[in-house]
UniProtKB/Swiss-Prot annotation:
This is Maturase K. InterPro entries: Domain_X, Maturase_MatK, Maturase_MatK_N. GO terms for molecular function: RNA binding. Disulfide bonds: none annotated. It comes from Ranunculus acris. Usually encoded in the trnK tRNA gene intron. Probably assists in splicing its own and other chloroplast group II introns. One of its GO terms (biological process) is tRNA processing.
């Protein structure tokens, strides 16, 4: 117990007070705006993300003056169902304040991150944030494991629990009251779930950084137990997450946890200690895999459910955690269908004058392109119908031919870039064919011609726009194998510069 006390004891000097006055500083909004422009999702314009013409020093000064003069942030007009936020410009001002709020609230976390690494050598790498960096890890680890827990991240019963947890990091009462105001004003706590986010995507994009911070903090809370468990395991090392996991509430409710499990805490940890347990997460889903028995995985399942409900007060159910065998289950994660399958091979063994043929099977991680969901995403974006037949994009016919080809080519290269690590490339070729034919139909519709006559007139240059840039990049990265296009098409290539998934790939 003394070890737990030392481990979960929080350094009070790391808390930062008086963050609320920063909302009245002009440079905060300038920093938030500049950061937003540099962190846009690839292939999405500023108009889509609502950043166009939304910032100027005059608007910021006007906002700050209103904040000084306003006694109450919410003003009710004659219609009690409608609210005015800081005057008439509700959407603009609320978005600016939420962006500034998100930039300020990260200060305590950033200071703690810097202080936690003082005096330590930190390995510099630009690839730590890449989505593709997860798959080489899976290739090395998953082939030796048996079972996987497919977990949906739980969410709190009420957003007030999140505000209470933030009090461990932020002591400014005014700042916390402002957080409550935002959550009550928008009634948007349910949008923390992935499905609700997609349904209310426009509102979420306008307040993207604010809600992403709250959601990420909520996830860090639910994962804080793994920071302690990794000390008891050989393979749960995660240095990069050490500064973001809260430690106070876990020790504060340890007695309640004892009553639930009716056992000594050290004994409970020993029961679930597993040197072959691996954990990783992206968005609202997390994966835990182990080499243990099905009984051990069931223990992990109910341990997590009880821990989240009794310690963190997160709503969760056993049916949100699925136990599957890696050998006969496809894992839908990060836009890929991944599975572990035996890869048979024949080895010729020569001993003196005798030769032996040995059949062996080595487990290999297969990463496949989910063709059906991707076609559904393309159909939703009006590139094809649900059966995969290409259709034209009437909304793009007003653009120049070069712009239309460039937009289709950019989407096509984006797919090729992300799914370059697929074990089988045929589904990817089908997606590229749908996009190329959709581009041809769009151009033919614009020029009031048939697809066949238009392709005949355009010639091979049409295909080069889709293929030549990708081939040049690969030949530069892999000059030794670029001479053989057949061999290159079979190679799995992981890129370490992908930090986001395009909307069409976000399945």
């Amino acid at each position: 117990m003394e070890e737990l006390q030392r481990y979960f004891k929080m350094d009070r000097s790391q808390k930062r007070d008086f963050l609320y006055p920063l909302l009245f500083q002009e440079y905060i909004y300038a920093l938030a705006h500049d950061f937003g422009l540099t962190k846009l999702i690839p292939y999405e314009s500023m108009q889509i993300l609502s950043y166009e013409n939304k910032y100027s020093s005059l608007i910021v000064k006007r906002l700050i003056i209103r904040m000084y003069q306003q006694k109450h942030l919410i003003i009710f007009d004659n219609d009690s169902k409608k609210k005015k936020f800081l005057g008439h410009n509700k959407n603009l001002y609320s978005q600016m304040i939420s962006e500034g709020f998100a930039x300020i609230v990260k200060i305590p976390f950033a200071l703690r991150l810097v202080s936690s690494y003082q005096g330590k050598e930190i390995e510099k790498s630009i690839n730590l944030g890449s989505i593709h960096s997860t798959f080489p890890f899976l290739e090395d680890k998953f082939v030796h494991l048996n079972h996987v827990l497919d977990v949906l991240i739980p969410y709190p019963i009420h957003f007030e629990l999140l505000v209470q947890n933030l009090r461990c990091w932020i002591q400014d009462a005014s700042f916390l009251h402002l957080l409550r105001f935002f959550l009550y004003e928008y009634h948007n706590w349910n949008s923390f779930t992935t499905q609700k986010m997609k349904q209310n995507s426009l509102f979420f994009k306008e307040n993207r950084r604010f809600f992403l911070f709250l959601y990420n903090f909520h996830v860090y809370e639910s994962e804080s137990i793994f920071l302690f468990l990794r000390k008891k395991s050989y393979h749960l090392r995660s240095i990069s997450s050490i500064a973001f996991l809260d430690r106070t509430h876990f020790f504060g409710k340890i007695e309640h946890l004892k009553v639930v499990f009716r056992n000594d805490f050290h004994t409970m940890l020993w029961l679930f200690k597993d040197p072959f347990m691996h954990y990783f997460r992206y968005q609202g889903k997390s994966i835990m895999s182990s080499k243990g028995t099905p009984l051990l995985m069931k223990k992990w399942k109910y341990y997590l459910v009880n821990l989240w409900e009794c310690h963190f007060y997160f709503w969760s159910q056993p049916n949100r955690i699925h136990i599957n065998q890696l050998s006969n289950h496809f894992l839908n994660f990060l836009g890929y269908l991944s599975s572990v399958r035996p890869n048979p091979s024949v080895v010729r063994n020569q001993m003196l004058e005798n030769a032996f043929i040995i059949d062996i099977a080595i487990n290999k991680l297969n990463t496949l392109v989910p063709i059906i969901p991707l076609i559904g995403s393309l159909a939703k974006a009006k590139f094809c119908n649900l059966s995969g037949q290409s259709i034209s994009k009437p909304a793009w016919t007003d653009s120049l031919d070069s712009d239309i080809i460039e937009r289709f080519g950019r989407i096509c290269r984006n797919f090729s870039h992300y799914y370059s690590g697929s074990s089988k490339k045929k589904p990817l070729y089908r997606i590229k064919y749908i996009l190329r034919l959709s581009c041809a139909r769009t151009l033919a519709r614009k020029h009031k011609s048939t697809v066949r006559s238009f392709l005949k007139r355009l010639g091979s240059e049409f295909l080069e726009e889709f293929l030549i840039e990708e081939e040049l990049v690969l030949s530069f990265i892999l000059p030794k194998i670029s001479s053989s296009s057949h061999r290159l098409s079979k190679e799995r290539i992981w890129y370490f510069d992908i930090i986001r998934i395009n909307d069409l790939m976000n399945l």
